[in-house]
Amino acid sequence: MSGDPRSFSFNQGDDHPIDSSQQPLHPTNTMADSYSDRNWGAPGGLDHTHSMRTQSTATPGMDNLGPAAVGGGISGIALGVANSHDRQSGVDAFRDTDGGNFPAERGYNAPGSDNPYVPPPPAAAYDSSDNLTARSGAYGSSAALAAAASAPAGASNTSRRSFVDSPYQGVGALDAGPYQRQSVYNNGDYPLVINPDEIIDDGDDGFALPNSKSAGHKSRAVPAAAAGAAGGAAAGGLLGGIFKSKAAAEGPSYGPVPGAGIEAAEKGQWAKPKPGTGSRKRGWIVGIILAVVIVGAIVGGAVGGTLGNREKESPSSSETASGDEKVNGDLGKDSDEIKSLMNNPNLHKVFPGMDYTPWGTQYPLCQKYPPSQNNVTRDIAVLSQLTNTVRLYGTDCNQTEMVLHAIDRLELTEMKLWLGVWIDTNKTTCERQLNQLYDVLDKTKDHSIFKGAIIGNEALYRAGSSIAEAEKTLISYMTEVRDHFKKNNINIPIATSDLGDNWNAELVKASDVVMANVHPFFAGVSVDLAASWTWDFWNNHNLVLTKGTDKKQIISEVGWPSGGGNDCGDGGNCPNDSAGSVAGIDEMNQFMSDWVCQALDNGTDYFWFEAFDEPWKIVYNTKNENWEDKWGLMDPARNLKDGLKIPDCGGKTAT
């Protein structure tokens, strides 16, 4: 969308530019006018939007970005919500930090560490979606979980994705993992422990958790046996110091954390049994082993049983990325497997864009276990039935090249790509990503396939010790890219994406497109109000920033989880199971029904988060918040979730 912002109407044909006499979409809009907030005073109507928070909660001297500040984070999603539910999407690994050095956005006293979100007003304050015209319609690895074990024999399958495995598992503030989107453990109770001796050191990036199993990209599926083994390994971690995987030759085998579990005991008193007690202790050892094996098998079987729909392995299944290509060749549009994937009548091209991260693209782990081109091709084949535009978050591990190759092999002449560059405090990482961006552009003859380059995602929380410093760093990188593009006659837009309320006049000036991440689920809004709330928030916080300019506005992330609990604007602290934003298939269906087709009719440009579940994110789930791995339209095997219905919008498709 460019030029004057357009109103979002819930009546068909009521699409028109907003004029000064037009009333706000919802009565709650007037709430903002009753509060005196900071005015940026920028020309061209670049005024800071008013927050619905009262001034009594503002923190002076923090540029309205302190704890519970006016406009802190997303007013409604809020900075505090962003800190407790940061929907991260890029290489969010604090590679140059140590265990005691928490970055600002995760520190306990960081700006916005509390939650300033005002609970949603009564239903009358929003237009209920009942009034809307609803349409019918990697590489896995087994991390050392404290005393967790090496994978059991046979569990080191290099072609299957595990619900508990990932090459880019994060550990709280130490390693949030590349391209992740998880809630932060505010209580500091991180689920994993890093063994520094097992960290792969490439000279600049650290804390990428190496794991015992590697999985290639033949499929996203995890066979029940492998899943059971993975679950058993996690539950029966005490066996790690005793059993070694027979598949160790296929990938690195990592034992439990030193000093923990049976391995530590084995090196201690068990290593030198007292005279006359050997047989008795051996008996106890055997008994313990058998008990743990049984418990591990039971728990592992339960985990395997929860995998749901799994992709059926073809006779030509292979174990590694190279093996996949050796057996199946370089998949293309004429491959039988691809033809099947591209012929799903339940998928409809109604999404303007999709957020996407190929599996196995963590640096430096991908240097040892390269991601699979064929797996990316399979993904793009499915994505092509949902959208014509794909967004990436980084350039590491040849992910951009693989997506471009997949588009070429599938002959998707209408498919476009938003390039992504990850920005954080690690200069080596940023420079590597930028150099890869330049290399991709140099090697691509026709730049018309690119819709733009997104420099950083929510970088204001990770590119500096403060938001002001991070913004300065981010803008400097954007300026560098702009200068490079101008020098080399590269004519594509340059943008960044961040939380909706983080945008200000300076950031708008530096970016060709205003890209805002807006998640109604984390605002604690009931699903029947979610579509209306999303539009209201975006309209009042982001569209206004481009008034008087020709800059486009895009919602860079929006979605709804299919399960895992409910959020009342302060995480899973809800009074009951039906309060706030409830995750579920029915709710996901309703949000899509209320939002997708009307946004398509209204010309709203957005990226849906996301196409596929990312099961490894289960490590970030907590007692009351179990949704991190459930944001996909499809399961990891590329199967549409049971009961989910993607609107067909009367046959209208996104362009």
From Swiss-Prot:
GO terms for molecular function: glucan endo-1,3-beta-D-glucosidase activity. SUPFAM superfamilies: (Trans)glycosidases. The active site is at 458 (proton donor), 557 (nucleophile). It is found in: Cell membrane. One of its GO terms (biological process) is cell wall organization. Residues 19-33 have a biased composition (Polar residues). Disulfide bonds: none annotated. Residues 304-655 are extracellular. Residues 1-282 are cytoplasmic. It comes from the Eukaryota. InterPro entries: Beta-glucan_modifiers, Glycoside_hydrolase_SF. Its EC number is 3.2.1.39. It is a single-pass type II membrane protein. Residues 1-61, 89-114, 305-338 are annotated as: Disordered. Keywords: Carbohydrate metabolism, Cell membrane, Cell wall biogenesis/degradation, Glycoprotein, Hydrolase, Membrane, Polysaccharide degradation, Signal-anchor, Transmembrane, Transmembrane helix. Glucanases play a role in cell expansion during growth, in cell-cell fusion during mating, and in spore release during sporulation. This enzyme may be involved in beta-glucan degradation. Active on laminarin and lichenan. This is Probable glucan endo-1,3-beta-glucosidase btgC.
